[in-house]
Amino acid sequence: MPEDYEKYRMGSSNESHQKLVQPISSSISKSNKKTKHQTDFVQDSDIIEASSINDEFGEVKRDLKARHVSMIAIGGTIGTGLFISTGSLLHTTGPVMSLISFLFVTTICFSVTQSLGEMATYIPISGSFAQFVTRWVSKSCGAANGWLYWFSWAVTFGLELSVVGQVIQFWTDAVPLAAWISIFFVILTIFNFFPVKFYGEVEFWIASIKIIAVFGWIIYAFIMVCGAGKTGPVGFRYWRNGYAWGDGILVNNNGKYVAAFVSGLINSIFTFQGTELVAVTAGEASPRALRSAIRKVMFRILVFYVLCMLFMGLLVPYNDPKLTQDGGFTRNSPFLIAMENSGTKVLPHIFNAVIVTTIISAGNSNIYSGSRILYGLAQAGVAPKFFLRTNKGGVPFFAVAFTAAFGALGYLACSSQGNKAFTWLLNITATAGLISWGFISVSHIRFMKTLQRRGISRDTLPFKAFFMPFSAYYGMVVCFIVVLIQGFTVFWDFNASDFFTAYISVILFVVLWVGFHFFFYGFGKDSFKMSNILVPLDECDIDSGVRDINDAEFDIPPPKNAWDKFWANVA
């Protein structure tokens, strides 16, 4: 074990902590030559001392509490995907295949979050896993992956804005859709310029509403299944007589259900996207809070996703015409359809208010996540350095503004092809997110190999992931396979529009990867050196940014009352 690392582990040197916050290892770009066209980026030679960057640009602040971190993770996931896009999934695949799809994605999500937890608690830096790919895979791959992941959250913000007005139109269409989009566009953008502690506090209370609403709906659904509704006991009524599997795809082919399952995966993945958000907060939260949040991911997934999908499939038949009728996205929400079918007249309006709150919260998280990813990319030297600038509250304001600008995509909903635009944006964000998930697993594999090369036991880490390294390989392989096959239906009746909708994120990633590679290394011999294509294990930086999780500054105050204890266990 290296001497500096041993000093860090023992907490014997305060000076070592100053060294360990350097944003990136100089080893990643030993062979880089600073050319004229690279001067707008932070180069490794420019960031030898983190303090010099902080003096010039400022830095983010660790003002997020444990409860904030957990709620941000929940706030970014319980949103449009769960409440709205699950209707399309249920209609396409039927209740059983929808549930299987959710369980399958749960295994991927568990693998990815475990990998991320082990890395982010050890090196808690902003936009963490975007920097991990840069450090342990390659600088160009890290740049491409980071920018694609940022792009997915920027586009998702536009998607949330495109939906929020249509959800409000469940009550009235007196106000134009563009007006609602503009109102929330401005409010959410301005709010993200406030210090992160305000963001964390608001997100905590909004996410609390989500949790209470989802728990309440699950209890309501159970009661309706048992017979409290106007239709009497429902039980597994909609799973019998062929209802369980839906119509599938390829009606005249024995593989129609497999095809439906693969086709529905993209909706499932979009619903789960955001469970990794807890690691994005790493630079502004206690590593102990991260560890606690990661450990509860499986509980959240099983309750908020799998149970909800189970009850939706029990209460709403896959061929219910309301799942596909026109009249706004909320009309297609299985949550509201279940209430309407059960004869509960008031609850749909109450729950629609929850959905509005949920989408606003998700949009808020989109800007936060995207801006911190962009900040992390600038730290890693793969984004313009002005994205490092922070205001007095520690908010990277240029990164916030640039991310929020993509909310303008929400105005696509005002066109006659609003539903098509929603599907287009959903596919882009889900596929981009899945690519990022795959590279989280790749980074973790490289991280574990580097630890092994140095003789460092994973038992000494603040958080040790389960089922490793097999789980990381599983996550990597499955993510990349799904990315490649998720759009297979476009090849049956090929047209360019559907092809690009399905694979634009893949194309963008490859273009970014190749483009950044030649940008950093030029077109000479350096660009073809194996050490520039894949960082050698001996040069992988696992020292910069390491923090001692036992430091007093990371202490988490114990719950003061029953209310605090409840949230400590749930969130």
From Swiss-Prot:
Location relative to the cell: Membrane
Disulfide bonds: none
Record key words, sorted: Amino-acid transport, Membrane, Transmembrane, Transmembrane helix, Transport
GO CC terms, sorted: membrane
Protein origin, superkingdom: Eukaryota
Topology term for the membrane: Multi-pass membrane protein
Gene Ontology terms for molecular function: amino acid transmembrane transporter activity
Transmembrane regions listed in the UniProt entry: 69-89, 93-113, 148-168, 174-194, 204-224, 260-280, 297-317, 343-363, 393-413, 422-442, 465-485, 504-524
Pfam families listed in its UniProt record: AA_permease
UniProt similarity note: Belongs to the amino acid-polyamine-organocation (APC) superfamily. YAT (TC 2.A.3.10) family.
Function summary: High-affinity permease for arginine and lysine.
Listed name of the protein: Lysine/arginine permease
